[in-house]
């Protein structure tokens, strides 16, 4: 009979002192409490440099699952680009150099578009300023910025700070003008709401939309109308003819793919059925900062790095059977991200997707689909089929994001109940359960002023090893989880995995 090793990821559960904002501590969790009391446990760093992000940067589910599945620190796009700027490699970047050189030779304009903030989730203003610097060094004189306003990864009314920082930077560097401004709601849609994308596109290509004397004046007018950064309607800046036309150079400096795809397709793709585009707007010399989609043919400045010997691959190499199971909200995380950004399953890797409930916000159903996930998993455990199981419970994170404390407490209590039933079953089979998380969230549901906190945290996450054998554990990082699981399965850790087992 197989003795399964199960990794249970309680998404969004960080460790923090018990207080009236810590939903995890306020919840009644008899099962988790008993594991902390009776089994070895430690904490893991899940943010900043420990997961390949800049120091102090909050972790997220994509980054967390990449690091867990890879068994090594995966340097995220933000860190890669930061490093390239620091080392001077950005200025030698093949695609960025090429597009700037060709644009200059053709006497055309260079357009830099992307999210204008230092949120570090989709983009960073420092990357934009570095590109403007590079354009100056390359001798380009027609450089236009198309600023997408944030208000989501940063405060809802912070755009003026970033506009002033950009304008000061351009003045110092000696090149660049803001040509258009649009809230990310329009320019960075990801839900195929093409009517939104079309409005941003028309500002970029036709100069249509609102008009303002300056970028700041347009934002101030929006504020006066009660419209915050994310929702600012696309407008052009008077006196700046920065329309994107055929033959121009275009660099989209966002590094996160999901919200960069639609506007990229509109500006770049030859076939585009979603709305009418004018003649003379294509082809442009387009460069994506990172790979937004394998089917987008535009050149990429920072192509993906291949991650070899992920946990899933190593299990497959040893002929082991593995199961990945989660509800919709976290299914991509236990499959695509856990496998190092690879869509196809490994040999003997089975997947179960449980639909997430169709509710407007998850505080309305904090249990989400945890019960259905649990029942499906218990049924699989009866089959004596799997050596390793990767399970994600979405509740702590998705309900944590709502900022509703009572709902987050309910979410945690439901997950505790499910965890108890799963652990009992695995122990009855002689297996082991590692309980952990990918980042913090629901342990901080409010700010010090009492306003809701809906964001992730930089808190460490727990790691509990529930098994018949008593082990000693030490502190670590998310990348140390895969080597630990391999040790429990008596499999040699591959050299590519630089994480270290948590077992002393």
Which stretches of residues belong to each language-model region?
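Feature captures the catalytic ectodomains and active-site-proximal regions of enzymes
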Residues: 1-504
């Amino acid at each position: 009979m197989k003795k399964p090793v199960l990794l249970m990821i309680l998404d969004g559960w960080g460790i923090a002192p018990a207080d009236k904002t810590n939903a995890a501590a306020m919840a009644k969790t008899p099962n988790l409490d008993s594991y902390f009391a009776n089994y070895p446990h430690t904490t893991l760093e899940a943010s900043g440099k420990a997961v390949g992000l800049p120091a102090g940067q909050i972790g997220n589910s994509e980054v967390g699952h990449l690091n867990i599945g890879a068994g090594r620190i995966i340097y995220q796009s933000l860190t890669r680009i930061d490093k390239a700027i620091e080392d001077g490699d950005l200025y030698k970047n093949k695609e960025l150099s090429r597009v700037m050189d060709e644009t200059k030779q053709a006497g055309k304009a260079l357009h830099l578009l992307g999210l204008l903030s230092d949120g570090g989730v989709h983009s960073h203003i420092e990357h934009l300023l570095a590109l403007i610097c590079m354009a100056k060094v390359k001798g380009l004189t027609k450089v236009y910025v198309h600023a997408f306003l944030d208000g989501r990864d940063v405060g809802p009314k912070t755009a003026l700070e970033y506009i002033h920082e950009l304008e000061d930077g351009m003045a110092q560097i000696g090149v660049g003008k803001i040509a258009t401004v649009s809230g990310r709601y329009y320019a960075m849609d990801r839900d195929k709401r093409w009517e939104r994308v079309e409005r941003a596109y028309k500002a970029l290509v036709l100069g249509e939309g609102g008009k303002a004397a300056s970028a700041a004046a347009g934002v101030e007018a929006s504020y006066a109308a009660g419209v915050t950064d994310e929702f600012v309607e696309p407008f052009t800046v008077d006196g700046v003819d920065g329309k994107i036309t055929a033959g121009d150079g275009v660099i989209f400096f966002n590094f996160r793919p999901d919200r960069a795809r639609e506007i990229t397709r509109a500006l770049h793709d030859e076939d585009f059925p979603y709305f009418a585009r004018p003649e003379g707007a294509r082809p442009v010399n387009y460069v994506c900062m990172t790979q937004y989609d394998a089917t987008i043919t535009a050149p990429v400045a920072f192509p993906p790095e291949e991650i070899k010997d992920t946990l899933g691959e190593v299990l497959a190499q040893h002929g082991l059977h593995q199961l990945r199971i989660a509800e919709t909200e976290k299914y991509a995380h236990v499959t695509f991200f856990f496998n190092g950004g690879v869509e196809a399953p490994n040999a003997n890797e089975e997947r179960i997707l449980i639909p997430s409930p169709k509710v407007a916000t998850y505080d309305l159903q904090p249990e989400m689909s945890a019960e259905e996930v649990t029942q499906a998993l218990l049924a699989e455990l009866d089959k004596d089929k799997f050596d390793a199981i990767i399970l994600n419970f979405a509740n702590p994170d998705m309900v944590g994001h709502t900022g509703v404390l009572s709902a987050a407490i309910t979410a945690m209590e439901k997950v505790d109940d499910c965890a108890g039933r799963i652990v009992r079953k695995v122990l009855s089979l002689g297996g082991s359960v590692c309980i952990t998380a990918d980042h913090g969230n629901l342990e901080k549901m409010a700010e010090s002023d009492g306003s809701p906190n809906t964001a992730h945290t930089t808190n460490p996450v727990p790691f509990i090893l529930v098994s018949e054998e008593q082990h000693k554990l030490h502190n670590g990082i998310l990348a140390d989880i895969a080597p630990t699981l391999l040790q429990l399965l008596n499999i040699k850790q591959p050299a590519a995995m630089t994480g270290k087992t948590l077992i002393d």
